[in-house]
Design a protein with these regions (language model features):
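DNA replication initiation on ssDNA origins
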Residues: 1-114
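Short aromatic/hydrophobic-glycine micro-motifs
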Residues: 12, 51, 134, 173-174
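Structural beta-sheet core signal
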Residues: 56, 147-149
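Structured loops at beta-to-helix junctions and adjacent beta-edge loops in soluble globular domains
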Residues: 60, 92, 118-120, 140, ...
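Surface-exposed flexible segments
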Residues: 66-72, 126-136
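DNA replication initiation modules
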Residues: 99-132, 151-180
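Short, conserved phosphate-binding/catalytic loop or strand-edge motifs used
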Residues: 138-146
Length: 180
């Protein structure tokens, strides 16, 4: 499946535009970069959730390579992760378990809301996208980017979401490590 096949099969929202003025270049910063809060980003990539479902976010301070990334639910009543910590938002929403606990597990899957393309520019050449417009593109480290494709309608069939992700990986549009 090619990027064109994916775009045809799964219509996408236009580029997500985050309304903010570019910031001035300063100590440690880059000029022309749009600033967005964690809360605004989560709201943009999860414009609608199945009833009773929540987005999952993982957050930790310190070295992100040490230890796990436990997920917690995100909703307006909870505090968003700090911009000072390492944060990760998954592409799917999940239902709480029967005991009320929240875990990002297949058994609690609600819907897939976007595709995340990781390691663009390093493991996956940016020209591999061949002019495809992403919903967002974030430089996560020098020369390494994460891109996203917000789906027009969330996929509520987990098997379909897995097949789509596998097709994106098989097409060479994302690092194979994104499947786990």
């Amino acid at each position: 499946m090619t990027a064109e096949d994916i775009e045809t099969a799964f219509p996408l929202d236009p580029l997500t535009v985050f309304l903010s003025d570019p910031v001035e270049a300063g100590k440690g910063g880059e000029g022309g970069v749009f600033q967005i809060t964690n809360a605004d980003f989560v709201a943009a990539v999860f414009p609608c959730l199945p009833e009773g479902a929540f987005a999952a976010v993982s957050s930790k301070s310190g070295d992100p390579s040490i230890g796990g990334w436990p997920a917690r639910r995100v909703d307006p009543a909870t505090e968003m992760p700090s911009a000072e910590t390492n944060n990760f938002v998954g592409c799917s929403s999940f239902y709480p378990g029967d005991d009320g606990s929240f875990k990002a597990r297949k058994s609690q899957f609600a819907a897939c809301h976007f595709l995340m393309l990781d390691d663009l520019g390093t493991k996956v050449p940016l020209d591999r996208l061949d002019g495809f417009d992403l919903s967002w593109l974030i430089e996560t480290s020098p020369g390494n980017h994460q891109g996203g494709i917000i789906l027009a309608e969330p996929l509520i069939d987990g098997a379909v979401a897995v097949r789509l992700l596998n097709a994106v990986i098989e097409a060479g549009l994302c690092d194979a490590g994104a499947s786990g």
